[in-house]
Design a protein with these regions (language model features):
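Hydrophobic beta-strand segment of the Class I
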Residues: 16, 169-170
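Core SAM-dependent methyltransferase catalytic element
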Residues: 261-287
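Conserved alpha-helix/loop element of class I SAM-dependent methyltransferases that forms part
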Residues: 25-48, 55, 67-72, 89
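A short acidic, Gly/Pro-enriched loop at the edge of an enzyme's catalytic core
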Residues: 157-169
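C-terminal alpha-helical "lid/dimerization" subdomain adjacent to the S-adenosyl-L-methionine
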Residues: 204-260, 266
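Class I SAM-dependent methyltransferase SAM/SAH-binding core
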Residues: 75-107, 119, 123-158
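N-terminal, positively charged/glycine-rich alpha-helical extensions of SAM-dependent methyltransferases
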Residues: 1-17, 219
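A short glycine-rich, Lys/Arg-flanked "PGG" loop and its adjoining helix->strand segment in the class I
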Residues: 182-197
Length: 287
């Protein structure tokens, strides 16, 4: 990514989360939560934690912590992860209970136990996340949150990881900032394991009249002003509005993702099309 954009994000890092929440009226928090909950359901359906598996309750057989033979580790990458909000939400949602009921997971280990159809226990383990971003200023904000994660400064189009390193990749409001979205999709496909998921939460180029009016008329009037007032960086929030208008529509993005090998599992529209959650799957049959 170009250095002026990196410099811009470094300059707003300390106020980034606050302004995201403020400018979206805290809707961005709900959007992330929805995405993580839906990923959990997808993972259950596709066999990472089967929906037809019963949960470990007080009446179910207990399993020693060191004797879970069928443990499935979830390797998480929060790409363009900034301050780590998406990864933090993912872990909180995962540790709050299984996909099919309200049974609690172990907050110390980040695990959930299930019973398979034959009665054997299996455990679902979330490993420490990797939070990757090109801005060292944004990554510096990860540590104060005490997130169980490793921060890595990287280029989303050329990541320092081997193939099939992750089971889940999150990308929240970062795809617009990559010079080559196709290149970022192909690279995400490369490092994602077969059967894994890429979730893209993004402001796509508006496609209906209301959203075109909002982003082309209303947003340029108040978003840069509010951004300047709270961060002193008006140019960063002018860039935000312009990057949305210049970006792909959600339909064009999904078409591009399919051309890169992904299956589009779901497109979720938030708040009338202000933002979208796109859930992409790398086929199990992928080499």
């Amino acid at each position: 990514m170009k250095s002026p954009v990196r410099h811009m994000f470094n300059g707003i890092a300390s106020r980034y989360d606050f302004l995201n929440h403020f400018l979206s009226c805290y809707q961005d928090v709900l959007w992330r939560r929805y995405c993580c909950k839906y990923l959990k359901k997808l993972m259950a359906v596709d066999g990472i934690a089967p929906e037809n598996a019963g949960c470990m309750t007080s009446n179910a057989p207990k399993v020693a912590d060191n004797a879970v033979e069928n443990a499935r580790k979830v390797r998480l990458l929060d790409l363009c992860g900034g301050t780590g909000d998406f990864a933090h939400t993912f872990r909180k949602i995962f540790e709050g209970g299984c996909a099919c009921c309200s049974a609690k997971m172990n907050p110390q280990k980040g695990t959930a136990q299930f019973l398979s159809q034959n009665g054997t226990a299996r455990e679902f383990v979330v490993e420490p996340a990797v939070i990757g971003d090109f801005s060292y200023g944004m990554l510096a904000e990860v540590k104060p949150k005490k997130i169980d994660a490793h921060a890595v400064q990287l280029d989303a189009m050329k990541m320092p990881f081997a193939e099939r390193q992750f089971d889940v990749i999150l990308n929240g409001f970062g795809m617009r900032n990559v010079p080559d979205a196709r290149g970022a999709l192909l690279e995400s496909y490369r490092v994602l394991d077969a059967g894994g998921y890429l979730c893209v939460l993004e402001f796509f180029s508006p496609r209906n009249l209301f959203n075109k009016f909002f982003y082309k008329v209303l947003a340029p009037l108040f978003i840069p002003v509010m951004g300047a007032f709270f961060s002193g960086k008006r140019d960063a929030y002018e860039y935000l509005v312009n990057s949305i208008i210049r970006f792909l529509s959600v339909d064009d993005f999904c078409k591009m993702a399919e051309e890169c090998g992904f299956e589009v599992k779901k497109v979720k529209m938030f708040d009338g099309g202000i933002s979208f959650g796109v859930f992409l799957h790398k086929p199990v049959s992928a080499a």
